[in-house]
Amino acid sequence: ITIVDCSDYPKPVCSLEYMPLCGSDSKTYSNKCDFCNAVVDSNGTLNLSHFGKC
């Protein structure tokens, strides 16, 4: 299982850095910040499927 540490999130603003991650919802998130904010919003139900686009 691939783990991303989201303990520093949520953050109000994410950078425009593009390092895609694929969530367990089959959605591609543009970077760790976008992904971690979504994880927080999902109350922990969202996980990382893999690094890169879905």
Curated annotation (Swiss-Prot):
GO cellular component: extracellular region
Ranges for domain Kazal-like: 4-54
Principal localisation: secreted
Domain of life: Eukaryota
Bridged cysteine pairs (disulfide): 6-36, 14-33, 22-54
Site (Reactive bond 3): 16-17
Keyword terms: Disulfide bond, Glycoprotein, Protease inhibitor, Repeat, Secreted, Serine protease inhibitor
Record localization: Secreted
Gene3D superfamilies, sorted: 3.30.60.30
GO MF terms, alphabetically ordered: serine-type endopeptidase inhibitor activity
Glycosylation sites per record: 43
Record text about domains: Avian ovomucoid consists of three homologous, tandem Kazal family inhibitory domains.
Name under which the protein is recorded: Ovomucoid
Taxonomic lineage from the root: Eukaryota, Metazoa, Chordata, Craniata, Vertebrata
